[in-house]
């Protein structure tokens, strides 16, 4: 199973992934786009072509882990719709969550200090296209996810 969490940088993808993983039993792993870039694809920059390579690498990594029977939760910007479409064909079980957040609020919070840059930043000079064919859209108001919310999300995932 691969759960693919999409949203702006700073939208809460990693937080949601960590909350879900605490409730998932068995072999599980969190693949975070920031960690992959830091440790595995550090040679890639932030151009669209390098972002595409990074996204493809992450998708392939998730496929490998799925083939080893891991429950994979991936938090990623995922700005390429063709990768979202390919994921539905690539993975045995795939569930896509769009963590929809108000960009003005994210930019104001600027937790990762990336929105003060003006080059090659998604949401600033690179468009963030709304993800397609989402299995679940969560409107993040930046309040903690309750146990009931996490349970409801996992129930929706289990229903596929």
How does the language model describe each region?
Residues 73-75, 87-109, 138:
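Conserved phosphate-donor/acceptor-positioning beta-strand/loop module used by diverse small-molecule
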């Amino acid at each position: 199973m691969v759960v693919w969490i999409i949203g702006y940088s700073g939208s809460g993808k990693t937080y949601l992934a960590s909350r879900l993983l605490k409730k998932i039993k068995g072999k599980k792993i969190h693949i975070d786009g920031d960690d992959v870039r830091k440790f595995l694809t550090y040679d890639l920059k932030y151009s669209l072509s390098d972002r595409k390579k990074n996204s493809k690498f992450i998708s392939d990594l998730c496929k490998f882990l799925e083939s080893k029977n891991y429950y994979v939760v991936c938090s990623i910007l995922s700005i390429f719709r063709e990768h979202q479409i390919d994921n539905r064909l690539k993975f045995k079980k795939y569930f896509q969550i769009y963590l929809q957040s108000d960009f003005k609020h994210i930019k104001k919070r600027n937790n990762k200090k990336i929105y003060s840059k003006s080059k090659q930043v998604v949401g600033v000079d690179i468009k963030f296209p709304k993800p397609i064919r989402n299995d679940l859209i969560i409107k993040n108001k930046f309040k903690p996810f309750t146990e009931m919310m996490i349970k409801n999300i996992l129930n929706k995932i289990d229903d596929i």
